[in-house]
Amino acid sequence: MRIGSYQLRNRVLLAPMAGITDQPFRRLCAYYGAGLTFSEMMSTNPQVWHTEKSKLRLAHSEDLGLNAVQIAGSDPLEMAQAAAINVEYGAQIIDINMGCPAKKVNRKLAGSALLQFPDLVEKILREVVSAVNVPVTLKIRTGWDKSNRNCVQIGKIAEQCGIQALTVHGRTRACLFEGEAEYDNIKAVKQAIAIPVIANGDIDSARKAKFVLNYTGADAIMIGRAALGNPWLFQAVENLIEHNSISQMPSLKEKCGQILRHIQELHQFYGEQKGYRIARKHVAWYLQGIQPDSVFKQTFNAISDPKEQLIVLEDFFNLILDKKNVRTTT
């Protein structure tokens, strides 16, 4: 699949997720096969462009592949300025968020709230596309609510404005993340436009990914929540849809090693004052796939020292692997 002049390594993408798709997590997903990863959503408010938090969200390295940055806002000129600034910082793809269902985003008329105003959508897309010399993509939902599904209309507007690829999450804003993804509506969008369409929503296995690709005719799939605590999912999906082969999941030993490295990188990336707090939610997600009924989560969440976190986590993994007293962290 191509986005503008860029050939992606495969058709399996990691969704941009606020508070999750930082550099350490994107690196892990890319290692296991994500063909493209996106930064966390960046506000187009000029007051936050140069903050430390924004710099962390924009952090990128070559091993992550293409530098794709997602922006969110509602003012066309402000959106265009933000896109241009991000390109100056190294963004190779700009993604526009018109899919986020969060109230705090929608109250500012950003994210999926914009789907209620197709004329404003068009103004934003035209301004952003004309402001940068890199591909611009768009992420939407199927509409604001079930009575106002307009994803086909928005898709046509996007194509006319020069958007290079369109991601459709198969739910309305009103649905949030409840119910089942509307693959029929993603299929309708794909049939209505010529630009690449990326299917998103409820893709939690390699078989589901293959089904969604075949059913919708989409050019690629995007994985979001299913990757939490499960970055190796990309490996299984890539092998099935690109090579028609079923791959073995990484061994428990490999998973434990990767989790330890991920937590250590979070400590280094965010610093001692913040890294241990970010690590807690990731460990909780990882435990769901290793020992979902474990009380270890409470133990881990009570720790505020990064080094102690690593020691306790490795001891826990050693107990699971029956390798007691074999510690590599100090």
UniProtKB/Swiss-Prot annotation:
The protein's Enzyme Commission number: 1.3.1.-
PROSITE patterns: UPF0034
Transmembrane portions of the chain: none
SUPFAM superfamilies: FMN-linked oxidoreductases
Record keywords: Flavoprotein, FMN, NADP, Oxidoreductase, RNA-binding, tRNA processing, tRNA-binding
A UniProt-annotated Pfam family: Dus
InterPro entries named in the record: Aldolase_TIM (IPR013785), DUS-like_FMN-bd (IPR035587), DUS_fam (IPR001269), DusB (IPR032887), DusB-like (IPR004652), tRNA-dHydroUridine_Synthase_C (IPR024036), tRNA_hU_synthase_CS (IPR018517)
Source superkingdom: Bacteria
EC class of the enzyme, as a word: oxidoreductase
Keyword flag RNA-binding: yes
Signal sequence extent: none
Annotated active site: 100 (proton donor)
GO molecular function, one term: tRNA binding
Reported cofactor(s): FMN
Catalytic activity: a 5,6-dihydrouridine in tRNA + NAD(+) = a uridine in tRNA + NADH + H(+); a 5,6-dihydrouridine in tRNA + NADP(+) = a uridine in tRNA + NADPH + H(+)
Residue numbers binding FMN: 16-18, 70, 139, 200-202, 224-225
Record-stated family: Belongs to the Dus family. DusB subfamily.
Function: Catalyzes the synthesis of 5,6-dihydrouridine (D), a modified base found in the D-loop of most tRNAs, via the reduction of the C5-C6 double bond in target uridines.
Protein name: tRNA-dihydrouridine synthase B
Gene that this polypeptide is encoded by: dusB
